[in-house]
């Protein structure tokens, strides 16, 4: 991957969404060179919208998202859609990269394509095989920042481990949306989570993120218990200090 600016993706006071539908606001985040961040959140919280806003495919509602100097982004979904289904793997690599058959076989071997696999038409490949192919092409295209939306969907364990190994070895920057917590724990050194219209930043892997969430939940529970105690005490004091009704005298 080519060298790029230290600040790869920059978000400043960013609000994302569509029209009146705000998905997240007040986002101030910077992804630096070599960092691998995973974007988490429940369905519909705006993960893909954030990716598309960063890539300039969706306009921000407020603020801005910038891509650093000399940053070359490889977007998994786009490359996936651009594959020519009629070409064989060998044709694709010879035409697009000018590789010899020997070099093509060696590159594809690293992604678990062996023997006659090189003569398969791209359209006949399984979802997992296509995912491995796209990852290889992104790196060959010179991308130094990979943006991946659910890259391990439809992958078997072996294919997933191959993708994990490729991303771990990749010396550029990665931003990935994934529901696969094992995959996220293997590759991410930073977690961004969209929740309650905010993007929270955890500087560590998935295990670290879980620990932090647990601590936050415990703190919240403690705070709630303390507030409840204060409320009960205040109520007690109010009752104690309330003027007592004077019994009427019976003549």
Question: What is each PLM-predicted segment?
Answer:
Residues 3-251:
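ABC ATP-binding cassette signature C-motif
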């Amino acid at each position: 991957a080519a060298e790029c600016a230290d600040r790869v993706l920059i978000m400043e006071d960013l609000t994302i969404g569509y029209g009146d539908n705000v998905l997240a606001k007040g986002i101030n985040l910077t992804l630096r060179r070599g960092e691998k961040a995973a974007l988490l959140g429940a369905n519909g919280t705006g993960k893909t919208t954030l990716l598309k806003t960063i890539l300039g495919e969706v306009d921000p509602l407020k603020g801005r998202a910038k891509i650093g100097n000399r940053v070359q982004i490889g977007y998994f979904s786009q490359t996936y859609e651009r594959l020519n289904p009629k070409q064989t793997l060998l044709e694709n690599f010879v035409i697009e990269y000018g590789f010899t058959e020997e070099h093509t076989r060696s590159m594809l071997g690293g992604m678990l394509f062996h023997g006659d696999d090189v003569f398969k038409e791209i359209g006949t490949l399984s979802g997992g095989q296509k995912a491995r192919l796209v990852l290889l092409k992104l790196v060959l295209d010179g991308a130094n920042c990979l943006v991946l939306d659910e890259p391990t969907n439809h992958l078997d364990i072996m294919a997933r481990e191959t993708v994990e190994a490729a991303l771990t070895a990749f010396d550029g920057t990665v931003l990935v949306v994934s529901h696969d917590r094992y995959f996220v724990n293997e590759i991410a050194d930073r977690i961004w989570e969209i929740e309650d219209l905010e993007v929270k930043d955890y500087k560590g892997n998935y295990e670290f993120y879980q620990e932090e969430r647990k601590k936050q939940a415990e703190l919240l529970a403690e705070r709630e218990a303390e507030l409840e105690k204060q409320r009960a005490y205040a109520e007690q004091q109010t009752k104690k200090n309330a003027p007592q009704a004077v019994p009427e005298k019976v003549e």
